[in-house]
């Protein structure tokens, strides 16, 4: 080994002869004595090149520059009094160099590695191997390692078996577009990269494996967001002979144990509340609510219907909804600031937004007067109506009430977006807190207005509630599902369900989704046939590793916790992928590139 110790040296190492190897983090020349900070994965330690100790070492020290790769031999000693550095783990010790060797030189990096300064992301992705040397990225990848290690051990301890499933599979689109791989041996035919191992893990339950998991790579050719990548990693799990409560208890134990192990400094709830899908939409405007703050949506349709405000009366008369949220401390917003919120609501899909300011000064609701109220709608509402709206939305003097009226689905969606926007703007969320919950009682189907057909809310393998089976023929919209999501801080971090395990029921669901028998047999015949050989009741779940590590690391993009991610245009800037390939490779695959003109 070229090193005997890491650079994370402490007082316990004083007097020890060590051989270190790492990168020059900083270099300082103090009039004949050279100091460097030597960095490796574990830490940073000060190394002293003193001519009284070794003139040859000093000559090497003079050659050093940032990011040179260096081996040093020396003895760990106390730093002289007054030179200690409390900001470093090794700040009480130093190594006086007795021997040194430059293992490699380095060009000047395109950005500072020894400073946590903001760097253009494109540059970071192009030089990702340098970016990972920086403290933030290094720590994120260590958190990722600890997370995956805990997950594996947790499931191993509970009798799960890790089984790898194929990456080259049949294309059976599950919502997003597949990544296709042309077959050289079978011209005109294609493999697909898996969007998830969904059918494979269900087949493993038919095979009698009972408890399966894998750290699975998944691929989806979809539009990207901060928490999306074309390839991502999930902890894929499936169990036989379980119900929803069994799976949710497993998830609660997994996530609470994981946080306690990997980030014990973070606050988190050990018991996860269960919120119905309907309640989540009505109270928070989305099915993955951030519960670190309140600002729940308040239904004021009845107040609007009986008020003198024509806009509200018309919406209520047409069966629409009128809802409000309260922005604390925003009562002093001027016209320009309120206009900004109105435009934001329109961007999210509302026809407009009605702000009601309760004055700039804080106080109690009982002391509110009409003189304190500032709103274009104030002349249409009585003081009692405004107080009731304020009471329902949790507003007090000094706050700002925001009201949206229209179709219920739109109202919920717009105010849900406004709620999250205001929470970020007003800094209402504790960044060191993880607020978990289960969202349950999802519908099985949703109507696609554009396609004029039913879609699965989750996926077509989710089991319906047994009590709702008669509704499949008469009212699919009312059929409930046996699905459960784990949400945290406004993100879905795991989605799961009890699965269909009867061939006839699975075929019926496919029919409702618009497949005919020929399409069903061609795409899913292997699964339906397997169900005829004694498929056990089973269920599963798949926590997204990238997304949860993002939350553990306190980041806002999964690109910050993936070693070599694609950018937001799905490009790999380091390797230059996707790229043009050799004509012979194209010909060997029996495919032709069609130009735009064609």
Curated annotation (Swiss-Prot):
TM stretches of this protein: none
Primary enzyme class: ligase
Chain residues that bind L-aspartate: 174, 220, 458, 499
Positions contributing to ATP binding: 220-222, 229, 492, 544-547
Residue runs in coiled coils: none
GO BP term (any one): aspartyl-tRNA aminoacylation
Catalytic reaction list: tRNA(Asx) + L-aspartate + ATP = L-aspartyl-tRNA(Asx) + AMP + diphosphate
Keyword vocabulary terms for this entry: Aminoacyl-tRNA synthetase, ATP-binding, Cytoplasm, Ligase, Nucleotide-binding, Protein biosynthesis
Quaternary structure (record): Homodimer.
NCBIfam families linked: aspS_bact, PRK00476.1
HAMAP family referenced in this protein's UniProt entry, alphabetically: Asp_tRNA_synth_type1 (MF_00044)
Protein name: Aspartate--tRNA(Asp/Asn) ligase
Organismal lineage: Bacteria, Bacillati, Chloroflexota, Dehalococcoidia, Dehalococcoidales
